[in-house]
C-alpha cells in the first residue's frame, strides 16, 4: 500500500500542474469565493452552531474526524449550552468503528487511511449513539455521475440544502473531490456544509483543511460535480469508489 501511495502522488501533482497551467478545473476564474465574514444567524441555532464548532483537521488524512466532531458538537450544543466541546482525540478514543483511529495514523489500518463514504456514514451513526444524541435519521447518499439537472438525487440535495439554511433541521457532510472545488490536488476529502444561498444557488463549505484559511462558496453545479466525481481508479485499492454526502436529519 505504501508503494501504491508513492505512485499516486506524482500523478496527482501532474494533474494539478496541468489544471494550473491551462486555467482549467478549479483554476477557472471566479469559481471560488472566499467568505470573510462569519455567519451568525440567530434564527437558525443549528447553522450558528456548526459555524461556531467548526474545526480544522490535525493531519492530512483526518478530515473525517474534524468534520464529524464539528457536527457532533453542534448538535450537542443545542441541548445544553454549558456542554464542553468534544476534542478530536476524545472522539477517536470513544468511537472505534472501522478502526477509525488506526486509519488516522501514518501507516493507516492495513495501509488504508481516511474514510470512504459508506464507512463515514457508519462512523457518524455510531458517534451519535456514543454521545447519546437523538436524531430523526442518518442518510448515506451516493451521488451518481452524469445525472441530468432534474435527477431526483440533485433535487433532494437542493431541498436539504434549503431546509438546512432556512430552518436548521439537518446537517450535511460532503464527501467530495477537493480539487473540483478549490485549486488543490484531486483527492477524496470530507467537510461540512456551512450555508446555502437559494437565490444564487451557491454552497458555502466549512472546509476542515487547514490550508483553506477561510470558508468558501461555490456554485451548486460545482458542488455537485465534486460530490459526483468518481474518484480515480487508483483510489479503489483504498476503498474509495465515489463521493456523496451524509445527511443528519435532526428534526
Predicted regions and their residues:
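Conserved active-site-adjacent core of cysteine acyl-enzyme catalytic domains
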Residues: 95-188, 194-227, 231, 235-243
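Cysteine-nucleophile protease catalytic domains, especially the papain-like/related folds used
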Residues: 17, 27-152, 239-242
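Polar/charged alpha-helical tracts
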Residues: 2, 6, 89-93, 155
Amino acid at each position: 500500500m505504501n508503494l501504491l501511495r508513492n505512485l499516486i502522488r506524482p500523478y496527482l501533482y501532474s494533474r494539478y500542474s496541468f489544471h494550473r497551467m491551462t486555467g482549467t478545473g478549479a483554476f477557472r476564474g471566479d469559481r471560488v469565493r472566499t467568505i470573510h465574514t462569519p455567519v451568525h444567524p440567530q434564527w437558525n441555532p443549528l447553522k450558528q452552531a456548526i459555524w461556531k464548532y467548526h474545526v480544522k483537521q490535525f493531519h492530512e488524512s483526518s478530515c473525517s474526524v474534524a468534520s464529524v466532531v464539528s457536527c457532533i458538537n453542534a448538535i450537542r450544543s443545542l441541548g445544553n449550552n454549558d456542554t464542553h466541546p468534544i476534542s478530536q482525540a476524545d472522539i477517536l478514543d470513544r468511537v472505534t468503528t472501522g478502526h477509525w483511529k488506526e486509519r488516522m495514523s501514518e501507516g493507516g489500518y492495513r495501509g488504508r487511511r481516511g474514510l470512504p463514504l459508506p464507512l463515514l456514514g457508519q462512523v457518524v451513526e455510531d458517534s451519535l449513539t456514543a454521545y447519546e444524541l437523538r436524531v430523526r435519521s442518518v442518510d448515506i447518499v451516493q451521488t451518481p455521475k452524469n445525472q441530468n439537472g432534474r435527477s431526483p438525487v440533485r433535487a433532494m440535495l437542493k431541498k436539504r440544502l434549503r431546509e438546512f439554511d432556512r430552518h436548521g433541521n439537518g446537517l450535511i457532510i460532503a464527501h467530495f473531490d477537493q480539487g473540483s472545488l478549490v485549486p488543490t490536488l484531486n483527492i477524496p476529502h470530507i467537510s461540512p456544509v456551512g450555508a446555502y444561498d437559494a437565490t444564487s444557488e451557491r454552497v458555502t463549505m466549512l472546509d476542515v483543511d487547514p490550508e483553506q484559511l477561510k470558508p468558501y462558496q461555490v456554485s451548486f453545479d460545482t458542488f455537485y460535480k465534486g460530490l459526483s466525481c468518481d474518484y480515480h481508479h487508483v483510489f479503489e485499492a483504498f476503498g474509495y469508489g465515489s463521493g456523496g454526502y451524509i445527511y443528519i436529519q435532526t428534526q
